[in-house]
Regions:
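Disulfide-rich extracellular repeat modules and their boundaries
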Residues: 22-25, 49, 64, 142
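Tryptophan-anchored aromatic micro-motifs
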Residues: 32-57, 96, 200-202
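N-terminal mature ectodomain segment of secretory-pathway/periplasmic proteins
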Residues: 66-72
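Contiguous, well-ordered beta-strand patches that form the walls/edges
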Residues: 47-53, 72-179, 186-197
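C-terminal or late-domain output modules
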Residues: 56-65, 188-204
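Bacterial Sec-dependent N-terminal signal peptides
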Residues: 3-5, 15-44
């Protein structure tokens, strides 16, 4: 129950933060410049299966707050080259708000997206859970098969090869939607990127 209350509190704080905090000088808040809302991107987008047996997924949903979406970025590792059997999934959860349009370095019309971290979760399948508990991956010893664990703010470099950001971290992104093809940049904490990262996602 405490965990549920904490998560609800974090999400409520983020929605308030997105609506009311003063954005730094890199962010344009003039509503008249916005041609797309973050909710215009609502959908599930999936990348192709990579040679490294990894796949990326972006899930954008309506947060229930005007012009604010929930944006969840999934990094999925598989055991096979066809990406049919999932070994682990890292899910980065954010609130997202479109802050205006710009043109990237390649001439694409993109939306500037202001992100705030809600949390980060890791889900392991049975291939990893025993080792994860024995070696206390991310400082946790209660991993369960196919069950998401909160790794927000944890240093997991020795197990998941990554150190995860804390909640309420502000990030900047750019999004581009062309028909059913979606692209984004690598998020930055220092200002809006100027190039898309090259991964093309297809709307499902």
């Amino acid at each position: 129950m405490k965990k549920i209350v904490f998560d609800v509190t974090i999400i409520s704080l983020i929605l308030f933060f997105v609506q009311s905090c003063s954005i730094d000088e890199n962010v344009t808040t003039t509503a008249a410049t916005v041609s797309k809302s973050s909710t215009d991107y609502i959908g599930t987008y999936l990348s192709a299966c990579g040679e490294n047996k990894q796949q990326a997924k972006v899930v954008i949903t309506d947060s229930g707050t005007e012009d604010v979406a929930t944006a969840n970025f999934h990094k999925i590792s598989h055991s096979d080259s066809g990406c049919s059997t999932v070994l682990k999934t890292i899910q980065y959860n954010h609130t997202a708000r479109a802050m205006g349009d710009t043109t990237d370095d390649d001439g694409n019309s993109v939306s500037k997206i202001y992100l705030v971290t809600v949390n980060v979760t890791a889900t392991l399948n049975s291939t990893y859970t025993s080792s994860a508990n024995e070696d206390e991956w991310c400082g946790l010893s209660n991993w369960e098969d196919d069950t998401a664990k909160d790794v927000t703010g944890k240093d997991c470099t020795n197990s998941l090869s990554e150190s995860f950001s804390s909640a309420l971290i502000q990030k900047y992104d750019i999004w581009h939607l062309n028909g059913t093809s979606f692209q984004k940049s690598e998020e930055s904490t220092e200002g809006y990127p100027t190039t898309l990262d090259g991964t093309v996602y297809t709307k499902q």
